[in-house]
Amino acid sequence: MQSERSLIPTPMPVRRHARSGNRGLALTALCLAVLLVVMDNTIVNVAIPTMSDALNASSTDLQWVVDAYTLSFAALLLPAGKLSDRWGRRRMLLVGLAGFAVVSAATAFSWALWQLVTLRVVLGVCAALIYPATLSSIIVIFEGSRYRSLAVGLWAATSGVGIALGPIIGGVLLEHYAWNSIFWVCSVIGAVALACIAVAVPEVRAYRSERFDFPGTVLSVAGVGLLVWAIIERPTYGWLSWQVIGGICAALII
């Protein structure tokens, strides 16, 4: 009997911070964080022609301002989710949003293409820290609540709204202000979401967690990164080019 019990896996409990927070404010803050992450990926598209004139760069080169964010975000999404389970989702959200607000403000001061692309890569890293922690936090905050499905539905709907809202807000801003105004707006939204999460979102993490698989994480980042890069470069080289085929094959092998 003793040996049989030892074979039964014990569930991994969740450790919560003493602060319970307000569910409504917490949901609003988490949805605002998701809105920021998704919107920042689409708000830049409408600013590319204006950036081209201001930075004296071609539209093709400036496309990497959009793609750099997508690439770093997609490559680090899975490792960031695993890290939030170990380190704490609230802590991950605070670090990600603080970084997002600061880097977005720094991006507004860019005067060269390489600066803009580099900072967009960093913004993608911050977005990867934020996005998975929002959903997992909502699931825990609304655990046992009849509104849990509604909260998750609002989270998903916010992602869709962010995709559509980005070009609209970007167009309005560019109608009256310079191209860097889109980054100032994102910085302000990030700061507001940061303050709300600091007040309303409790800390949650697992008591026990599996050992962090560093080699597997590196391979995951490399594989997803290569796959996303191949898809991004498909319009430039074509599906049958050796660059795209090689990138996809390397991603599948990894």
Where on the chain are the PLM-derived regions?
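Transmembrane-helix bundle of Major Facilitator Superfamily
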Residues: 2-199
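Hydrophobic transmembrane-helix bundles of small-molecule transporters
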Residues: 153, 175-254
